[in-house]
């Protein structure tokens, strides 16, 4: 079960990232100004390059880059407005996992995110996947609202620091069944 490496919806194209995209993707990463506040850390140096070359693989035995997709969200005029990744087969063999989903701050609020999530769900369903999972930092209220409003409403776990503080961080795992 593999998704397509390229698909279109309305005025957007989703395609697998290439080395030539690094500059644009780093710029989109930089547009997430409150990442450190919400997650406790910024993007590691070389994050995008590492995702393209090695994948951002889950912590499971046998994780393989052939199951990893870093995907670009691109307007028909060629402008890259975001990216996301998918890992096929985590945390189980029927689930695809999203570990990052980011729309450039300059174009947020135009329903691009909702449209892309709907297309990801349809693409995964068409490819035979039963569900999509993801993790959201609990301090990321905007992200929690976005994902729950898009049907990711089943809690699959909570991980992280056990005591709350300004410097403590936890993640909630959410899942959407593809019926």
Model-identified regions with their sequence ranges:
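Short secondary-structure boundary/hinge segments and terminal tails
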Residues: 47, 125, 142, 154, ...
């Amino acid at each position: 079960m593999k998704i397509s490496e390229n698909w279109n919806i309305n005025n957007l194209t989703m395609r697998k990232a290439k080395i030539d995209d690094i500059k644009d993707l780093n710029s989109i990463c930089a547009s997430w100004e409150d990442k450190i506040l919400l997650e406790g850390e910024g993007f590691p140096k070389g994050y995008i390059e590492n995702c393209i070359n090695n994948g951002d693989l889950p912590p499971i035995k046998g994780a393989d880059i052939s199951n990893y997709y870093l995907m670009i969200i691109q307007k028909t005029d060629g402008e890259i407005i975001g990216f996301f990744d998918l890992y096929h087969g985590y945390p189980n063999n029927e689930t695809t996992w999203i570990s990052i989903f980011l729309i450039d701050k300059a174009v947020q609020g135009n329903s691009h995110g909702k449209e892309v999530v709907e297309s990801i769900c349809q693409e995964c369903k068409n490819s035979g996947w039963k569900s999509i999972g993801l993790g959201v930092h609990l301090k990321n209220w905007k992200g929690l609202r976005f994902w729950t409003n898009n049907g990711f409403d089943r809690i699959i776990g909570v991980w992280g620091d056990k005591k709350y503080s300004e410097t403590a961080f936890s993640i909630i795992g959410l899942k959407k069944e593809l019926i």
